[in-house]
Amino acid sequence: RSSAASDVYKRQLYTFTGGVPKYIEQFMDNGCTSMESMVDFMLQPDSSFLTEGQALLVQEFGKKYGNYFSILSAVSNGKNTLPEMETVMGGMSLGGQLKRLEEDYDLIKKKRPILSKEGSQTVRYEVSDMFLRFWFRYFIKYQNYIEIQNFECLADIIKKDYPTFSGLALEMYFRQQMMESKEFASIGAWWQGKNNKDQDEIDIVGLYAEEKKALVAEVKRQSKNFKPDLFALKIEELRKKVLFKYEIESRLFSMEDM
């Protein structure tokens, strides 16, 4: 296996497992050497992966896992602001449960635009456990396929969506690397306002601990998809609105940097 191939393999393992050894071992012990074979392995009738997410939540929350389950499901499928979640759940108030999921169980994280105020309305949530994020996004959203054992169709959906989903994993991976470097006082993202459109969104912004300096990064699976001119415009907007006192270092993070 060439080093390039083994890098691809590591990325695929990380995308599905978030690096959890138990899941990685299952893939390796069963000879899963590609994204396709991992997906096919998870989608067998007797696969433990199909029920793993539920088992984890029952273990954490006992019989009361239902509401937490619904919240994680909503966030994994892009309903990531408090009003959106409360709408999905019939208008019930979720503040307390979100706080527990974040502070006691470390299953979700708040994302707010870098340097925005603590109480700002622009908070979004994300599931911080990579495996659960995957499990909810596919095994719960498409539960009907699993119930009638149409694993082929679901496998196709996951394989086609892999570029999008692995892009999210990539972003998480680089943020994790930045955290572990201990160089930053704050790491986040940036977007404008509540009804943000993608064009003003920046994937990663890190403020260095030592000086008034910021790392501003775009994450793309493949560097050929990077549009430097567009990124420069976004940085200008960010500089005007928030980072006017900072020296800005801009970076592209792609799969080659993993």
What residue spans do the PLM features occupy?
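Short amphipathic alpha-helical interaction segments
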Residues: 89-105
